[in-house]
Amino acid sequence: DSVRHILHKNGLPSPNNMNDFSESGGSVTTGVYILPGKPEDITGNMLEDLCLSIPDNPLIMPYIDNYLSLITGDPNVVDPKNIHKSKVLVFLASHKDVPNTLGLGTQKNYFDLNHANLDLLVEFFAKVKTLLEDGD
């Protein structure tokens, strides 16, 4: 509701539902997608959380969780500023060819981009594509 309020406050149309687009019929169409989407068992609300729900090797994830729990709170280690981003970097570091960003990890297929957890996001971008094609 806060996103819809901000859009209305600024004179922009808002969609009736999240992960959808406004039906204003005017010159401006707005779309809102709230990460991470579904399923609800994805913890957190960042792109990193969504990506960590679709790793190429899910068996590594408990080791990453264990590592981060061991160092968090250790007086000899500085706690991660952002646990979500730190978790992605540890996941990426677990690969033979180590990328240093989420985008590079995606390019190296370290995430299962065909995973069902991405279905809503794929549908949202398909709607974007349709809107752009219809606008030409």
What are the residue ranges of the model-derived segments?
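Nucleic-acid enzyme cleavage-core boundary/entry regions
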Residues: 82-136
